């Protein structure tokens, strides 16, 4: 919100010596975010004067049209003689009033003006455009042509309000009332302890039955609608300079008189308005929900297909506007041919949620929707309509129609009961009842009571909903900087839980293995499941959809970590980082089988155990997952060696690393699941409650997925359920036994069917070898026709060691034979001869 200081002074009698910086400091202290103070015309120096063009001579022989003009500037040049000026603009004629800058002046950008010879003539000054004066481009494509009533020789700096200060305020979503001069003026008056001249205090005629008919079919979407009519408008009337300048300084451009007035009143009072050409409205104005598939062409010239949830303004022919967002082109005021002489003014209060969803659905943000989304004072509608009527009568020569239409759905004002000492308890400062009551009254509240206060919240503050909001108002107005700095006395901590410790160990272990953590937003689009090649009935396709998503492309909560990680990998690869190893641990979300509506917890008391349990039961399941993605080189090449590329074995090893940190035995076997390559995918499982449970997958991604997502070749990934891994843990990680006695190594080569997983053979060998087995390692896989059709050879190195003695050859061989025997029994393995 851009607030010109000169405009602000109309409502608050600030000291003449107060600068924009001073006001900024006061408002920041009151809790507003004033980002900067823009100095308009700070480097501007006169003389600048109103001039009248006396003669124009067209100069020929140049590459572009050039005019030699004589301009009457009165006594501004000290002589009263006409000023000779060379100008290239074409949008003025003899007799027009223009802005002339004379020699000795300095324009914005340190542009000094002096008499100089150009195009064969001497130019004593310059005829100015708005851009040259720091006013911005007015869209005319030329110099400023002033209305004829301005007197020649008048100081143009004061006339055009070229010197001013503008506060640029970032209004937070809960402070919608500050998207107006009225709201900022109220905060300024409170900050300075000065009275406020409220621009909304106007004499408004009572509603009657003679106004333009209005029918509201959706009272929940529109609880207040005021319609006023102005007739006899001069279609040639244009916005005066003061109105144009205020709009420009507030960040809006001048369009036409009627539109400028509605924008001006919106900036002044915070109430969005819309003006309809009365001759283009057929029948009564209505407010209803759109019919699915209805069409509407909005003021931006775009034809929009409406949704059944859209709130629309209608006449007898159909929709004529998106309520609270943008009007329709069919009923707009004609500012090109100048045929509009009668207008109907709409000042309404629309449901903030409906407006926000419509604006987002149609990707159509407007100044009106921005205000309705944040909350507009419903009681300001009639005053805003009256202010608009007054300005149209004053500036366009119109007449106010006697009819006043006002359709209202009554609602009781919001009241809050608060102990008088509640702000004291929140802030730890003794304010006292008198201070609390005074501060609440300053923000517009009506306050009754002694120790227990009954507070009626003002209509322009929908953000005040509970006692803590009122306490915040008292604290911020008394000054956050006045709160004492005291260290709290926290209770003794109980340390991290076992789950928290595991999460930290997992992160440290992956970082130690060379992975970089890359947290991502938990939002996904459902199209990613098609890209991953998941089956139509895959559980991951059941998502929790957001009612108010940040992006329409990602409207759901993630059921897998891989989309975010792979997106991060793709972005980094596209920016030149090709050797990547990323990881993330985070929650995924699965809807419960029984959908429940979450209860709304109270804010003025502690929720009951039943309320908390009901809320918890409505939440989706949120297991924590861990995932890694790899691409490029895993080990860099150099003088020390060739290096090696990352492959799917690294992804499997990452899963084993997590299992070791959890103290869990991880079962790894061949698997097949999207988005992994069917021949290079490992299924990860643990034993939970005596049964094997698949908790994730690791391997190389499918080539089709890589192509669809634009990922590097041979990209690998792993994802597993960290909570399930923790549940399978024995709790305490057992360290390995350490023996000082020699190790006995036995190698075995077993021939098995190609379909037998290595993990099954290893598990049988480990169990059969008994407690003397220290470790087992697969060191060779061999396939040949000599082994037989459909056969492969797996070679293992078995290390045996005893804790209390040196093993004999016979003991090691016996353990080896037992291991081979059990492998033969379970997997059909045979010793390779």
UniProtKB/Swiss-Prot annotation:
Species per Swiss-Prot/TrEMBL record: Streptomyces avermitilis (strain ATCC 31267 / DSM 46492 / JCM 5070 / NBRC 14893 / NCIMB 12804 / NRRL 8165 / MA-4680)
Cofactor: how bound: Binds 2 magnesium ions per tetramer.
EC number(s) reported in the record: 6.1.1.20
Alphabetical UniProt keywords: Aminoacyl-tRNA synthetase, ATP-binding, Cytoplasm, Ligase, Magnesium, Metal-binding, Nucleotide-binding, Protein biosynthesis, RNA-binding, tRNA-binding
Every B5 domain range: 411-485
Protein name (database record): Phenylalanine--tRNA ligase beta subunit
Catalytic activity: tRNA(Phe) + L-phenylalanine + ATP = L-phenylalanyl-tRNA(Phe) + AMP + diphosphate + H(+)
Entry's family note: Belongs to the phenylalanyl-tRNA synthetase beta subunit family. Type 1 subfamily.
Location(s), subcellular: Cytoplasm
UniProt cross-references to Pfam families, sorted A to Z: B3_4, B5, FDX-ACB, tRNA_bind, tRNA_synthFbeta
GO molecular function: ATP binding; magnesium ion binding; phenylalanine-tRNA ligase activity; tRNA binding
Cofactors: Mg(2+)
GO cellular component, one term: phenylalanine-tRNA ligase complex
Keyword Ligase: yes
Subunit text: Tetramer of two alpha and two beta subunits.
